[in-house]
């Protein structure tokens, strides 16, 4: 209950509509009255910009919309922590940026601690306030997004400068 989870593949129930998917944690973890649950669901869908799709089925949604539904479900419990596993997996670059912006905005608005597991360097730089770099299960580096570009750790540099744009910056 302390942790809201955004799964890599969104993990929506195909047999439930958007509203039911978002409400699911409330149904299994709380004894909140139904009216209150629906108000929370609508509020969370509004926060992620999907307040008009609560009756749609997951099969009717784009990948970005599914991620937003997953985010709404992850925050519906007012959790202290939000854990995002590869939130940009399977998204086009523009949608990935929008999801990063949304995660950062919600982290600040809801005053939650957000942990993001990612291999997307854009996400690291854009939403990473405090970054920990793990390689083969070991912590090799930690710091902020300004210092990550100035490190001399070979494995981290290979990750940071793995795409052509970042190589040009270096």
Question: Where are the language model's segments positioned?
Answer:
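Conserved ABC ATPase signature
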Residues: 57-61, 65
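C-terminal boundary and immediately downstream tail of ABC-type ATPase nucleotide-binding domains
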Residues: 146-170
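Helix N-cap at the start of a conserved alpha-helix in ABC-type nucleotide-binding domains
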Residues: 93-95
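Conserved ABC ATPase "signature" region
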Residues: 34-52
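Catalytic Walker B motif of ABC-type/P-loop ATPase nucleotide-binding domains
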Residues: 82-85
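A short, proline-enriched helix->beta-strand linker immediately N-terminal to the Walker B motif
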Residues: 76-80
